[in-house]
């Protein structure tokens, strides 16, 4: 395919409409592209060629007959490997689920599929979503496509735990990808890979078919190259789902982004607690520059305080590990998960199956969570963490009576080198990597990461915008304005 490739979903849809390109031809090219880059970047754990070609053929027929299903008909999309996809293996990048093939699809993928989307493949992740680098996977680490080198351990991490999805979009293989976000797992890799990453309001998107990590914080996330594409995907998958009691019952009103955006009267808050230890000068400079841009455009920019931010990472860690210990208990080798050959007794079968199926990170969180949930520790750890979580949510509620949105860093720096990243423990790295992102999960509020510029090492630097619950319409509108001003140049070429 020696032509200029579409850069956005709108361009792709226009190409299909004008018949200058058809979904089947485009999907064949995408699969070749995915396979070619898979060996270098390790973004995909499996490429679903047969499924994709069948879906693309059906889409091509619909386009020829003029009976398309919407703006995503024929669009190539990747799905993180913790979302169930019918008849396509779903492993959570763990040996525990290495042979699991779901008989049903997650609601969010089901809705994309009904809209004509094409499943390119399942993407790499940290095991069960427990990580911030996409380095703890049975399939090996994912390499950031912005890396100066892909040799040895000198590559840049992709972020996590949805690193494979972020790289699939950033490298130009897919137009969009599904990630999950428990404490920043969509926004963190979006920041490091220079793409848009949205964590919607808790309850706006169905969690049915998303293999749970922390039920009270997990949300499906969206990764795209543009804010408009993000809105298109959100419109396709948001809304009530009778199979998930935590989704809101009110019908979703689609996001419509205006062509002209005026910021006069808009109130932007800069949380002082996010100017924290470890924040790089480049990120700090970028943060200040975008705040100035917003002010110059007519917005009011003021400092605000979120007093419980410093406690948030500790509370998040406690609650995360408590829920992990509960959720992982289902994998016993009998009902779910890997079954060990050593079955002299039920106790031995349980022990060996879990020892062989889980990696050290998962085991550590299970043990720590069980410790916090012991009768003697329950009140002083779990109960107290729940109380402080409520105070964190109240911080946001109070702030949003004074400002409309909060502007913060997404990550404290650009993507670190893999060889440096793995020197720290998973727990220590998550404490650093999730500092700016996990408070939004604690409060259940929507947040979006936007690429702003490149660092001196030519790596993406991103910022985060947070808003009140169910403010996606206005949140994405402001995000689109910022995007239009910074004009971030994406890595993926549109010419092949």
UniProtKB/Swiss-Prot annotation:
Gene3D superfamilies: Amidase signature (AS) domain. GO terms for molecular function: ATP binding; glutaminyl-tRNA synthase (glutamine-hydrolyzing) activity. GO terms for cellular component: glutamyl-tRNA(Gln) amidotransferase complex; mitochondrion. The active site is at residues 80, 161, 185. Its EC number is 6.3.5.7. It comes from the Eukaryota. Keywords: ATP-binding, Ligase, Mitochondrion, Nucleotide-binding, Protein biosynthesis. SUPFAM superfamilies: Amidase signature (AS) enzymes. It is found in: Mitochondrion. One of its GO terms (biological process) is mitochondrial translation. Subunit of the heterotrimeric GatCAB amidotransferase (AdT) complex, composed of A, B and C subunits. Belongs to the amidase family. GatA subfamily. Allows the formation of correctly charged Gln-tRNA(Gln) through the transamidation of misacylated Glu-tRNA(Gln) in the mitochondria. The reaction takes place in the presence of glutamine and ATP through an activated gamma-phospho-Glu-tRNA(Gln). This is Glutamyl-tRNA(Gln) amidotransferase subunit A, mitochondrial. It comes from Culex quinquefasciatus (Southern house mosquito).
């Amino acid at each position: 395919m020696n032509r200029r490739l579409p850069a956005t979903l709108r361009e792709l849809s226009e190409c299909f409409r004008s018949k200058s390109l058809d979904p089947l031809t485009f999907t064949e090219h995408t699969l070749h592209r995915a396979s070619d880059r898979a060996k270098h970047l390790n973004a995909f754990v499996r490429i679903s060629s047969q499924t994709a070609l069948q879906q693309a053929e059906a889409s091509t027929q619909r386009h020829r007959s003029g009976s398309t299903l919407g703006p995503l008909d024929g669009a190539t999309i990747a799905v993180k490997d913790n979302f169930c996809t019918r008849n396509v293996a779903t492993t959570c990048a763990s040996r525990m689920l290495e042979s699991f093939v779901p008989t049903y699809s997650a609601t969010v993928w089901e809705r994309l599929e009904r809209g004509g989307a094409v499943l390119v493949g399942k993407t790499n992740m940290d095991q069960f979503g427990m990580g911030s680098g996409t380095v703890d996977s049975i399939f090996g680490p994912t390499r950031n496509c912005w890396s100066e080198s892909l040799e040895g351990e000198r590559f840049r991490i992709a972020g996590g735990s949805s690193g494979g999805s972020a790289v699939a979009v950033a490298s130009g293989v897919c137009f969009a990808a599904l990630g999950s976000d428990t404490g920043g797992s969509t926004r963190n890799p979006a920041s490091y890979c220079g793409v848009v990453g949205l964590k919607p309001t808790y309850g706006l998107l169905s969690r049915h078919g998303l293999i749970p990590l922390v039920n009270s914080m997990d949300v499906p996330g969206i990764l795209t190259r543009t804010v408009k594409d993000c809105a298109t995907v959100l419109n396709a998958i948001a809304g009530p789902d009778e199979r998930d009691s935590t989704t809101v019952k009110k019908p979703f009103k689609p996001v419509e982004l205006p062509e002209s955006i005026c910021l006069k009267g808009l109130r932007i808050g800069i949380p002082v607690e996010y100017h924290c230890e470890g924040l790089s000068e480049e990120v700090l400079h970028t943060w200040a520059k975008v705040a100035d841009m917003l002010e110059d455009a007519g917005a009011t920019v003021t400092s605000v305080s979120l007093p419980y931010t410093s406690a948030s990472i500790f509370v998040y860690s406690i609650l995360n590990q408590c829920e992990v210990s509960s959720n992982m208990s289902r994998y016993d080798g009998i009902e779910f998960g890997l079954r060990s050959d050593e079955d002299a007794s039920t106790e031995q079968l349980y022990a060996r199956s879990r020892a062989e199926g889980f990696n050290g990170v998962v085991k550590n969180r299970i043990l720590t969570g069980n410790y916090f949930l012991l009768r003697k520790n329950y009140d002083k750890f779990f109960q107290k963490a729940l109380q402080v979580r409520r105070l964190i949510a109240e911080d946001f509620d109070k702030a949003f009576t004074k400002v409309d949105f909060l502007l913060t860093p997404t990550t404290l720096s650009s993507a670190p080198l893999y060889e440096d990243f793995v020197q720290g423990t998973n727990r220590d790295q998550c404490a650093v990597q999730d500092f700016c992102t996990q408070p939004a999960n604690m409060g259940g509020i929507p947040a979006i990461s936007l690429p702003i510029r490149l660092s001196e090492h030519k790596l993406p630097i991103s910022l985060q915008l947070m808003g009140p619950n169910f403010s996606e319409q206005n949140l994405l509108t402001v995000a689109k304005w910022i995007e239009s001003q910074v004009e971030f140049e994406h890595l993926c070429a549109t010419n092949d």
